Regions:
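Short, surface-exposed "cap/lid" segments of acyl-processing enzymes
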Residues: 188-222
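Accessory cap/linker subdomain of secreted extracellular hydrolases
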Residues: 297-365
């Protein structure tokens, strides 16, 4: 669900989709690309820093690319802008080094292009590893690195093995002709498994925000306790242009997560559970109604209409226009498929709202009558007290439903204060109490 209570300035977008701690099983046999020849080598006795110091945006791009290829990433940070330095030098280096630790050496580069937009030079390049392509955009302005976006796309199936025996099988899920990055996390003693369903908007398979990867952390934490999981990128992440316009919940969720669920059923030995986060808590009950699953975990979400939640978020930021937001929300709730004309409300087309208006979360949960664990937190800044109360008021008397409310966990689960955007670019541990609650629910 959309952000609450403040306008967070997105300073940069580092989207590294798989972090380190493991490595691919198979060694690469491809020849290593050794870097750009355009970065000058200093002559004997010449000061290295002075010799290699780039003077233009193009030279800085070549310098950064060369250091990425040679894995000498510590030399890049000195050219970062002040805004980029909201990320600590240690976190910055770890983030870039994680790519090699996970995917191995860069074996080639392709598709180099550049453009200038509003005074910022954008350099597009594809870094090729053995099994994945890393589509990067490097943003440079006035000789400083002002942003970097990294979009990992799998080419082949491959495994990432961790020291504790957990394995992540990475593959492309074919969903009605759309190829989506997918990761199945498991261990040798695996039984039950969980399909992870993210919140609204664009999301990679880790549900990455800043440097935080909640779905990856949940998957690895569950695997350590014998519970497998499958997570996939949303179609809106890979195919953004095609998803624009007449997108509905069918395209954003139901088709792809139905196919993901089929894959999980065919590749798991035990019971299957659905874990929905944020808006995913409203999607999971519908999927459960349409498929055979053993239970639901609804994590930091609400049963309230999404337009009402957005209205409250906007009104808290801009109280002078609260009546206007209330009018929009009331209208949004009346939109049907027949009345849709391609108009946008709260950054979503009316086709989307028409499909959303068919949801009835509380009623669906009662109807399917499955074991359900609902997890919320009083520190979640993207929902409100009435959202937590709504679960309790409507479902606390149901015998097969458990409701847990933690005190210190943010919307994505971490114990962080999201009023400081810099915290999103720091390393955080996912709370053990949440992982234990999920595993205890499944094992019981």
């Amino acid at each position: 669900m959309m952000g609450k209570a403040r306008k967070l300035v997105i300073i940069m977008c580092f989207v590294f989709l798989v972090c380190a701690c493991g490595k691919e099983n198979n060694e690469s046999s491809e020849e290593l690309y050794t870097g750009s020849s355009e970065t000058a080598s200093p002559e004997d006795g010449q000061d290295t820093t002075q010799a290699e110091k780039p003077k233009t945006n193009d030279e800085l791009y070549r310098f950064i690319l060369d250091k990425l290829i040679k894995n000498e990433v510590s030399e890049i940070y000195q050219y970062a802008s002040d805004d980029v330095k909201v990320i600590s030098e240690e976190a910055f280096e770890r983030m870039l080094l994680d790519l090699k630790a996970t995917f191995g050496e860069i074996v080639g580069i392709e598709d180099e292009t550049s453009t200038v937009q509003k005074g910022i030079s954008l350099y597009n390049v594809t870094l090729k590893y053995k099994n994945v392509d890393n589509h990067m955009v490097i943003y440079i302005q006035d000789g400083l690195l002002v942003g970097m976006n990294s979009d990992i796309r799998f080419r082949n199936s491959f495994d990432i093995t961790y020291d504790n025996g957990v394995v992540e099988t990475c593959f492309l899920l074919n969903s009605d002709g759309y190829e989506l990055n997918a990761v199945y996390t498991h261990s040798s003693d695996m039984g039950d498994a969980v399909l992870l369903i993210p919140g609204s908007g664009v999301s990679d398979y880790n549900e990455t925000v800043g440097l935080l990867t909640p779905f990856r952390d949940i998957a690895l934490g569950l695997a350590e306790q014998g519970v497998g999981s499958l997570r996939i990128e949303k179609r809106t992440n890979r195919y953004r242009d095609e998803a624009a316009g007449q997108i509905s919940l069918q395209e954003e969720y139901f088709v792809d997560y139905d196919n993901a669920l089929d894959w999980l059923v065919n590749n798991s030995a035990g019971d299957i559970y659905l874990l929905g986060h944020s808006l995913g808590t409203q999607i999971a009950p519908v999927l459960a109604e349409q498929n055979e699953v053993s239970g639901l975990i609804l994590f930091h979400g609400s049963a309230r209409h999404l337009a009402d939640i957005i209205k409250d978020q906007y009104a808290e930021i801009d109280p002078d226009n609260s009546d206007y937001y209330a009018q929009i929300s009331e209208y949004v709730k009346t939109i049907t498929e027949e009345s849709s004309r391609g108009l946008y409300f709260y950054n979503a087309p009316d086709y989307y709202w028409a499909s959303y208006n068919e949801l009835s979360t509380i009623e669906t949960i009662k109807k399917i009558n499955l074991p359900t664990l609902i997890i919320n937190s009083t520190a979640d800044r993207q929902i409100f007290e009435e959202d937590v109360a709504l679960w309790k008021d409507n479902l606390s008397e149901e015998q097969n439903i458990s409701i847990l409310v933690f005190d210190e966990c943010s919307h994505f689960g971490y114990k962080i204060d999201t009023s400081d955007p810099a915290v999103l670019y720091s390393q955080q541990d996912f709370p053990e109490e949440i992982l234990s609650a999920i595993c205890s629910f499944i094992n019981s």
